[in-house]
Amino acid sequence: MRTLLVVSSCVAVLTAGMLGLHALPGLAAANAPDLAGGGPWFNTDGRPVTIASLRGKVVGVEMWTAGCENCLNVLPYMKQWYAKYHGQGFVLVGVHTPEFAHEGKVEYVRAAIARLGIAYPVVMDNDYRIWNAYHNAYWPALYLVDKHGQIRYTHVGEGEYDVTERQIAALLSEKI
């Protein structure tokens, strides 16, 4: 009986990760941590992006790594949302946090960004400073930050793309 309970608990946790979680402890409706401590930056002419500099915009902070299959599966949606909503005030920032040592090399990340056709800003987070500031534990994870710098929505894993897109649109429609 105990074994069945342990197996059932593991399946529930794995399923929650695949389906997406919507609130991670301690961050819902909290001030979004800054993006400090990472680098280098790509698709920004090398200049860092800060949450403070993006006030008045809706920001998606995407935790990913180029070697993660789930991250690659959500990438078409990230690119689609960036293309569709960027002109309306949506900024997407990829935080590339390596799982394995080879994923932390600048050449690897630069080549992955080019190969995958990523046009939005990406920062390397080899020391997990940004990852830890967001209390993140999963790849991929998306944090939506409102125009006032508050985390208003989180999603972990794949799926529920329609829900996430509705959240982006709703946050964009809010007045400052």
What function would you assign to each model-found segment?
Residues 41, 64-67, 71, 131, ...:
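Signature tryptophan residues that serve as conserved aromatic anchors
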Residues 20-51:
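N-terminal "domain-start" segment that seeds a small globular fold
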Residues 10-22:
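Hydrophobic alpha-helical membrane-insertion segments, chiefly the h-region
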Residues 72-116, 126-132:
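Structural microenvironment flanking redox-active thiols in thiol-disulfide oxidoreductases
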Residues 57, 112-120, 124-169:
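Thiol/disulfide oxidoreductase modules built on the thioredoxin-like
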Residues 1-4:
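Positively charged n-region of N-terminal signal peptides that target proteins for export
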Residues 49-72, 78, 92-93:
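Short active-site neighborhood of thiol/selenol oxidoreductases, capturing the structured segment around
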